[in-house]
Regions:
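Membrane-embedded alpha-helical segments of integral membrane proteins
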Residues: 1-3
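Membrane-interfacial entry segments at the cytosolic side of transmembrane helices
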Residues: 5-20
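Soluble catalytic regions of membrane-associated enzymes that act on cell-envelope
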Residues: 16-362, 367-374
Length: 377
């Protein structure tokens, strides 16, 4: 068409019309093939939004009853990284071309999922969820960390394809405020002893407050593909863990694989079910987007069980770290971290006000990312 357009001036009007028609037809075909089937219809979108609005009202009333002015909410499974914006709740997951590299570095160090221009709630632990003031989690099924939440409420909506779906609102048992005091030497210790994400989190709780205890205890592994539900404590881990019968297992793999699959032998994964009011039992669990290297939560596994980690397409796993979470130590550390909270009295998109009582020599740790234009007074 372009050749004819250049060589036949008399046909230019007709050829211009023909090119516009071809482009229009192609756009229409693309929309029908790739656009319409992959997105929610208007009715389904509207119904889902109403359900989330109901839960937003419920969680706000619950937070108000506890005099909590600021908190964050997350989804156990994302539709997009910007679900918070879509459903009108404050979250830490975001997709943005102007995302700060420093925020990504922090997420990476703590084992949270990141990509080139996005960061995510995936990879969270009870500590990191609490550090980001995540008080509620929405899920269309079970919560991501069943040992650490309680069921608050639910809302149902009609699906466009027929039937209905239910969204559950879970409340974390321990949520730190937007800011709290830590020892002034804590940041330097974390940076000087940086390692895998579990080491980073242990370093934080043991250095941020006097008397802090390690919340992750190392397990036996072959370093790449196999985990045994038995302790292999580090030299500086003095916890007495004898008699442990069930291990709440987390692991982290360095790999370029798209998918990781954890398979349990000599036992099974047994987690509390809030939806069916029973215990869910399985022998395998799959983790997607594993090439973005984040902490994977396996769940409760009995002592002595063996967990095999396999990567998709026979991709190599260059390193693997596996730890069991210590709920008792976390309860103890949480109370220490929450001893000197920043009490938010009011907030908006441009201003946060609150009160804090402090002695000299402490740092105010907040989950407010630094950005030019913000000031403290």
């Amino acid at each position: 068409l372009i050749v004819w357009y250049k060589k036949a001036p008399k046909l230019k009007p007709f050829l211009s019309y023909l090119m516009v028609l071809i482009v229009f037809c192609e756009l229409t075909l693309n929309m029908n093939v790739t656009g319409i089937p992959s997105t929610s219809g208007r009715k389904g979108y509207y119904e889902a939004t109403k359900a989330y609005d109901q839960l937003n009202d419920i969680t706000k009333k619950d937070a108000d009853s506890q005099n909590v002015k600021y908190y964050r909410t997350e989804s156990a499974v994302h539709t997009t990284r910007n679900d918070g914006a879509r459903f009108n709740y404050n979250s830490i997951s975001t997709f943005s071309s102007v995302l700060s590299a420093n925020i990504q570095d922090y997420f990476d160090s703590m084992g949270l999922q990141t990509s080139y221009n996005a960061c995510s709630y995936y990879g969270h632990t009870p500590l990191t969820a609490s550090l980001f003031s995540i008080k509620y989690e929405y899920s269309t099924g079970e919560p991501s960390l069943p040992n650490n939440v309680s069921l608050l409420n639910s809302a149902s909506y009609n699906l466009e394809s027929g039937g209905n779906s239910t969204v559950y609102a879970y409340e974390y048992n321990n949520t730190l405020p937007l800011g709290f005091l830590i020892n002034s030497s804590s940041i330097a210790k974390m940076n000087s002893e940086a390692g895998d994400p579990f080491t980073m989190q242990n370093n934080f709780v043991t250095s941020a407050v006097n008397g802090g205890q390690m919340i992750f205890h190392r397990l036996k592994t072959d370093g790449t593909n196999s985990i045994t539900a038995q302790y292999n404590l580090e030299e500086n881990d003095t916890a007495n863990k004898s008699g442990t019968k069930v291990y709440d297992i987390y692991f982290y793999c360095e790999t370029s694989a798209e998918t990781l699959t954890a398979t349990v032998s000599n036992g099974s994964i047994q987690d509390k079910s809030f939806v069916s009011s029973s215990v869910t039992t399985s022998t395998s669990k799959t983790f997607d987007s594993a090439n973005q290297n984040y902490i994977c939560h396996l769940g409760n596994v009995p002592e002595g069980a063996t967990i095999s980690i396999s990567a998709s397409d026979n991709t190599a796993i260059s390193a693997m770290y596996a730890y069991a979470f210590d709920e008792t130590a976390w309860e103890y550390d949480y109370n220490l971290l929450n001893a000197n909270p920043y009490q938010v009295t009011s907030f908006s998109d441009t201003k946060i006000e609150g009160t804090l009582t402090t002695d000299k020599g402490n740092l105010l740790y907040t989950s407010i990312p630094y950005d030019k234009g913000w000031s403290v007074y």
